[in-house]
Structure formats: C-alpha cells, structure tokens
Amino acid sequence: MKELEKTYNPAEIEDRLYDKWLKGKYFHAEVNRSKKPFTIVMPPPNITGQLHMGHALDNTMQDILIRYKRMQGYEALWQPGTDHAAIATEVKVINKLKEEGISKADLGREGFLKECWKWREEYGTRIVKQLHKLGSSADWDRERFTMDEGCSDAVLEVFIKLYEKGYIYKGSRIVNWCPVCKTSISDAEVEHVEQDGFFWHINYPVVGEPGRFVEIATTRPETLLGDTAVAVNPDDDRYKDIVGKMLELPLTNRQIPVIADEYVDKEFGTGCVKITPAHDPNDFEVGKRHNLEEIVILNDDATINVPGPYFGMDRYEARKVMVADLDKMGLLVKIVPHSHNVGTHDRCKTTVEPMVKQQWFVKMDEMAKPAIEALKSGQLKFVPESFGKTYLHWLENIRDWCISRQLWWGHRIPAYYCQDCGDVVVAKEAPTVCPKCGKNHFKQDEDTLDTWFSSALWPFSTLGWPNKTEDLDYFYPTDVLVTGYDIIFFWVIRMVFSGIEQTGKCPFNTVLIHGLVRDSQGRKMSKSLGNGIDPLEVIDKYGADALRMTLITGNAPGNDMRFYWERVENSRNFANKVWNASRFIMMNIEKAADVSGVTEKDLTLADKWILSKVNALTKDVTENLDKYELGIALQKVYDFIWEEFCDWYIEMVKPRLYNEADETKAAAIWTLKNVLIQALKLLHPFMPFITEEIFCNLQEEEDTIMLSNWPVYKEEWAFEAEHEATETIKEAVRAIRNVRTSMNVPPSKKATVYVVSEDDAVLKIFENSRSFFASLGYAGEVILQKDKAGIGEDAVSAVIHKAVIYMPFAELVDIEKEVQRLKTEEKRLEGELKRSHAMLGNEKFVSKAPQAKIDEEKAKLEKYTQMMAQVKERLAQLEK
C-alpha cells in the first residue's frame, strides 16, 4: 500500500491518470455477446469549438452514466466524434485567409477545401484534448468525424434513397438568407434579438377612387418593392367593398390587388397587410393560396435588384431614401416606434433576410409521422417527461426542411446536371452518360448539405451503417442521448426520423435533457456580456473533479443552473475531505495487523451502523442513477462521506484505533477499509480522478477502479437494530453539543454525563458504546442509571428519545468567570440600547434618513433587546 501525499494536488494526478487510462484501453468497448451493451453517442462538438460550460455539463453527465454502466458489467460504449461545422469552419478559414491577403475566390473550390482540411488538422482536435482534461471516458479509438469516409458514404446513401423515394426535391421556398455569408442558414442558426425599430404607416391609393387609400404598416418599407397584393380579413366589414379592386403600389409603376385571406387579424393594426411573397414566410403561404407572383427584390448581398432609382442600394440605404420619397409624395402617414424581435445570424450577427430561393428540401409530412408515433407508443421517452410536449409540438407543426447551403465546406449535394438537356442525375459519383440524351457533359450542384443532415445520421453512421456491421447489430439502437433543451428540434427530432426511416428503429430509447449553465446572476453566458467562465481555468485552479461535482450537485434534468465560484471551492473542499480521510485510514491500516480474519461477530455497534448506512446508500444511489437523478445521487454520496463516515464513524472509532489493547481494533480497520472502498466506487462516476488515485493506492493489486464491480445492496448488511441504536447515541451527542454550545463551553472542558432511562435496552446501548460516546460527548465520565438519584438540582438536562441526559452545571461553567463575562456583556448592551433609542427618538434622523437605514436601526434595537433579556436571565440563574 502506497502512502498518499500529504495534500491533494489534482494537477499532479489528473494528466497522469488519464494517460494511464488511455494506455490501458479502459474506455474501449468491443462486441461481446456474453455482456449486455450500453451505448451513448456523444453530441459531436464543432471542430471550431472550444470547451465551454455547456460542453462540460453535457459530457460530465454522459461520463457519469458510462462509468456507472461500465462498473455494472455492461459493455459500455461512449461513441465520440466531431462535427465539420460547415459555416463556422468556412468563416474561420475565410478570416484566416483574409489575414494573409487571400480571398476564397482566389483559391477556387479545390484550393479552399485544402485550406479547410489543413485547418481541421491543426485545430480540429483541440476540443477533444479539452474533453480529455474533463476526464471523459469515451472510446477514443472509435473517434469519428462527420466528413470522414464512412460518415460521408452514409450521407450520400441517405440523400439518394430519400431522393428516389420522392422525399427530397428542389424547389422555391422562403429560406433564412445571410447577406454577409451569402448562404441560406437553418432556423437553428437564427438568433432572435429584440431591437428598437419603427412601424412605417403608408397609404396605398385605391385605383379609380381619388382620395381613397388603404393604410398599411410595415417594419421593412424597402420590401414594398416586392409587394404583389394587400390582404384583408374576409369578415372585416370596413374593406368588403374593395376586395378585388386594385391599388397603386407607391414608388413603382405597378398595380396590385386587394385580396381576402383569413391569415389577417382584423383587430391588429389597420387590418390591412401588405403581401410580399418572396420575402416573408407567412406572405409566401398567402401567395401560394392566391397564386401571387413572387418578386425577389434583393441580390445575395442584400442590395436592391429592382430597376429604378433604388437599384444597387444597400437595403438600409434604400429604406432611408424610400421613406423620404414617400413623405414627399404625401403617402407616409406616420412613424411609430416599435420594439420587435429581429432574426440575426448567430455567427456574424447580420440581420437575416427571408428570401425565396431555389433550394433542396426534405418533405417532412410523412417522415414526421413515425417520429410522433415513437413518443406516443413509448419507444422513446424524455427525461423530464414535459419535454416530450416540446418534441411533439415541433413535429406536429413541422415545415419542409431546407437542406442546401451555399458553402464549399461540407457534403456536396450529389446532383449532376446534364449541360446538354438539363436532366438531373442524383448518384454517388458523376455519371458517364446522361440517361435522357446520351451526352456526357455534367456539372455537379455547387451547394453543400446542411450540417444537421449528417449529424442526424450520427447514432448509426458512426457504427458502420449503411454496411451491416457487427457493431451496428450489437450497439444500436443506443440507450440514452444527453443533450440540451435548445436543440430538441434541430438535432433530436432529425435523428429520430432519420433513424426510423433508415434503420426501422428509434436511434435511442431515452433523451435526457439538461438546461443551460448560467452565471451567478442567472444570465446566459455570452461573449457580449463577458461573463463566460472557461472550464479549463476552473480545472487548472481546482481540478476536474471539483468542476464535475459543481456542475452536477443540485442539478435537476431540464433545469438551468447558476455557476458560483463558492460552489467550486466547496467541491474542492469535499475532495480534500475525501483525501484526508482516506490518508488517515490508510495510515492506520499500515500500522495494523492482518484484518482478513474479521467476521461479523467481531463487529461492534458502530461498525454495523456504518455498514448499514453505506448499504442503504448503495441502494439509493443505484435507484437514482437508473432514474437519471444524477444530482440527487451525488448529494447522497456527499452527505454520507462528509457527515456519516468522516464526522461520525471515523470519530467514533478513533479511541479504538489509538488503543493497542482494544480487541475491536481489527474490526474497526476492516470496516474503515471496506466502507471506504464502497464509498469510492459510488463516488467514482462523479469524481473519477481522486477515486482512482485513492483506490489504486489502497489496493495495489487493482489496476483501476473503473473496471471494479459496482456495489450491490446486501440483505446481511441491513443491521436495523444496530442502526437504530447508533442513531440514539448520535441524538444524545448532538443534544450534549447543543447545550455546551449555548453555554459557550469549549470542547477541552470535560464534564460528567449522566444518562437516565427506565429502559434497560437504552442503557445497554450506551454501555456498549461507552468509549466513543464519551469521546464524542466530551465526557470525563459516563454514568448510566434508571433515575435522578445523586444528580444535583443545578444539572443541565437534554431530553432525547426514551432517555434524559444530565450534566452538572458547575463542571461545565466557572460560575465566577461566567458572571463577570455576562456583566461585561450587559454593560456593552446597555450602551448599544441607549444609542439605538436615542437615534430612533431623534426626529431629525427619523424624518430625513432613508427608510432602509431606519429599518436597520429598528432591527438592531430588537436584537439588542433580546440579547439583554437572555443575559439578565442567565445572570439570575447563576446568582441563585
């Protein structure tokens, strides 16, 4: 047995242990038909990413579950990997090239992609190394990348299958367009930011009725150039007579109709809505219903493309000039300040432009149905259950999914256009002959696929699909997905419908949802607020175990949590407590004789009590982990180690350890070692480093704690009678300590303790525990009796269950010194009361001071009055 260092130094042990785990391949999982599999797929972090608190929480939760199941004997696979992060990586590479004076266009597609791969080689593994620092026990031998050969093959396979089935099509629809990145982006990449803007109220003249206008209100007056109708509610009596009439569209030479559509809320605004089908998703739907023209007014860089005075202007410049022109024409009614949510690109913060574009889409109506049924039938469940409603809401209101992106980095769409006849061929490789015209001039589609398209296949593409591999057969479907509530729609739903469509099985049976890690004020961590906390900084200062414990303690599924540095310090203090207790136990084991012969009959009341406690803890923690109550499980382990084991049991057995003649010393050491081993195992999934270091030093024959058996509940360790008996002793000790604290008696001052009870069984409990009871209760002598005979009237008492504890007053307190101390305190309080009364009686103070200051002084007066009453009462008792 190696002796532990005097102080716990995480920086010294964590990297060393992680290297040992990697070399030992302890994280590796293989197909093993004699064992039950347990699989988690890691949500692949972006290769552009750096570890943040969200990653730290997400991966700590996954690691806890994997370590737990591994110890339970499952073949536990935690499948890791990274995401190519199309737009994020492309932006990073463009910026890097810009610094070198090179543009994306200069390099061309192939040259630019080479730069992207170089960037990935240089920076793509950074976040993986950071996950190592956290202690993540993922099977790094199996690490995948969304653009590796296998995953790319899966993407092509799915695209072609869905296209052939008629689920993938190319068409014009409204997309989120970023004018800076010049690509469509997913809803997931649109960040809605509240901005102060305006409602511009504009009059549209009614054709043929001079002086009659229809008033509309818009937050984007420049889109007027793309209006193809004005809509009113069919039940709105104000406008029934003009439905079907034409309006002059200001600033253009066009006329547009007034149409009736139930989309319009007649109670909102003027009850008239301008319809711009090419630049608003709701207007697009109205346009489809009424067969309206779709006029795209913007170029890809958000400059105006409509011939006329505004041609070539930026959208905001055009807005300014158009509003001024409307005002000159007398058509600008008013401008009303208006705060509203504006969609911005989360990468570059540019305002996103809804725009009709030719894009590739996935039809969602049919694919959504089995994903809905999976939840309703119980194949899939959410923890907490309430998030199932969010999942259903998204699926029941789902729109076709725009999967094309105007980027170069990513999976290129496998569509080839015949340059002679225009036919489209979708295939894994460029066709040699056009099936329609027989020519061989093809050009591949320039667009790439949405990043979510490949990550939707992650649970099965990482296991070898579309090939029928042993890994896929054994490890799929996976067991649990751990993720944040913010990507239920963007990732979870897409994995479910993709998994069912391609494999016939739901890709996981449970989705464990966690919330966000917020700052101490409850704000979301962000660069703009400057309130982000780097997990690596926490690890460097306090160790990975302290960070993991902080993130999990008190954390309930689905709820946001606040990060406090004080909690990290508490976690570090707990690690120190575990270390110091283990070191103390190991030092005593070293000095002891062989304890292998200890049997149950050698165990004392206290030994059986702590065994019953760790036994009950084992049952509770196992149940909590099975229900994904990670925070509750950790809190129970913490309470047991800190309170029951360290503060009580170790203190109970110290008299036995320090007494060479004590016949029960071997039993104490045997119990200490066994309980410590069991507690370390229960703590291991949460705090892997410190538990590994202690466990392997305590038992040099063991290679690692992570492959040891998870503790199981033992009926023979229930020890109910001994448990109840020891709880009685603890109750008595607490009562004694409370009395002594109230009387300011230091632990060094011993006093006789009388235990009075008519119950022989109670007296026997104290008889059997006399030595540690005396030690914990600071007793010079323990006297057990059935009545109060011989106990002075001045004795201080405390009532416990079936007994009364007495302590002679004179043994606790030096009466003369205590009277002197109380008189000094009385004098001090008289001064404070006089000062407080004077302040509150001063009219000037009461009339001019802030109310908070007056309330503070009133509270002081109340406190001093109570303290004075207690001092006087105590003096009266002593002077008797």
Residue ranges: model-predicted function:
Residues 30-93, 146, 155, 216-218, ...:
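N-terminal catalytic cores of NTP/NDP-binding nucleotidyl/phosphoryl-transfer enzymes
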Residues 1-53, 76, 333, 346, ...:
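Non-catalytic terminal extensions that flank enzyme cores
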Residues 254-259, 446-476, 643, 647-650:
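Active-site-adjacent "gating/activation" loops or surface patches in catalytic cores
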Residues 55-57, 282-286, 494-502, 637:
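Alpha-helical support elements that line or immediately flank enzyme active sites
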Residues 33-35, 43-44, 79-90, 143-151, ...:
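Short, solvent-exposed turn/loop segments enriched in Gly/Ser/Thr/Pro and often Arg
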Residues 2, 16, 20-24, 94-213, ...:
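Residue patterns forming the tRNA-binding/recognition surfaces of aminoacyl-tRNA synthetases
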Residues 201, 393-453, 457, 501-544, ...:
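Feature 926 captures the class I aminoacyl-tRNA synthetase adenylation module centered on the KMSKS loop
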Residues 67-75, 96-109, 129, 133-138, ...:
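Secondary-structure transition/capping motifs at alpha-helix termini
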